[in-house]
Design a protein with these regions (language model features):
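C-terminal charged interaction modules
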Residues: 56-98
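Sequence-level detector for tyrosine residue identity
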Residues: 18, 37-39, 97
Length: 98
């Protein structure tokens, strides 16, 4: 029995779809060399780490704090959703669709 592999997360899955469509030779090479799983796992980890750092940094820069969350939860949710969306766009541009 093979040990259970860590599942590829959302970022890795998005990148997989991209390389299947737009980078066929690269995708096929990774399949032949049995390196696709490790590559996608690393993409997923790198993207998740970058996403977390971006969200944290943007929230600090924009004053989206735990105090705001306590004072005005609706405003906090709106601002955090906006920050997450912008961080997602950066990750997509810099890692996923690159």
């Amino acid at each position: 029995d093979e040990p259970e592999r860590e599942p590829i997360g959302l970022w890795g899955q998005r990148h997989l779809k991209y390389i299947q469509k737009c980078c066929k030779p690269f995708f096929n090479k990774m399949i032949r060399e049995h390196t696709l799983y490790d590559y996608l796992l690393q993409i997923d980890r790198d993207a998740e780490e970058m996403f977390s750092e971006l969200v944290k940094r943007m929230a600090i820069q924009e004053g989206v704090s735990e105090q705001l969350k306590a004072d005005n939860q609706i405003e906090w949710v709106g601002k955090m959703n906006n920050i997450r969306q912008r961080a997602t766009e950066i990750i997509n541009h810099d890692i996923i669709y690159n």
